[in-house]
């Protein structure tokens, strides 16, 4: 697809007071779709996610993941001159996104209520741990804390202890809902002509994802047990060791697959009629006995041999990849899902957005250095070179 094809959000300007993951993940997706995203950062240090690690040639892995295709503008919003720049910026903006500490945006005069009269078409998206209102609205919130508060940890891990997800799923979920809500607000503005306020709670985003375990524990019923990497209520569905030291992940969904699995994979057709395993509920209740039988059947086989049997039987399966395996994944390569973007550390690989379109190519522009675009953004707002120089001298930017 030609990069010249128009993108859905061409002409949309987003200003973001963002840090960490939730808001940057939201706005990076807006940038992918063509929006101009101006990222407001602290002069000197920038977004504190820049300092999380130095794994990407000296850059932070979190930061390069969530900040491509953005412009970095440094502003010290404690200074009057910087707040004046911000107001001028908002005159040209369609969307303001912020995930500052609770109450910080309001103290800066950047709440929807403070801005709506002067900027009636502006969409304001606030992302916070617990949302506005309620006893937790001022409580600090980080990804792991929300995983815990939402009940996610209670159903994740082993029987002995809970385990967090290996990536920032609470931040990601909030960022995804913020992104879709902004698209909805832009569509609504086409009908009403007015901007609107969006309130995204990390807690509520994660609780939405907890629908299955919540309903499983409906009206005081016992919740799903923690089952490690295996499914809590479907069996066999999870990882199994293989004779060559590898691990295979497999999943059965119905009784037809169970019979095929016994006959063609385990090559023990009679096991399908074992009264201990008649139906998923009994297989789940007797999972330890069934697991021992499966492990024994796989003990003389390699991962490839087990995979071949599962494929021939059309039983869903997967290898347990590490990160090197994902970088080299043949499916991603075959579908040409890797692109490249610039960065302060040079050109780096970047995964294309998962939803590909035949109508346009996503925007894949560089990850900015701190304040890299400050002078250009100020010039686009009408500030003369001598004014820009004065802002630098006064440490406004």
Give, region by region, the residue ranges found by the protein language model.
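Glycine-rich beta-alpha junction loops
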Residues: 44, 130-131, 202-207, 244-246, ...
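Terminal low-complexity tails and localization/encapsulation signals of metabolic enzymes
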Residues: 1-13, 241-243, 325-397
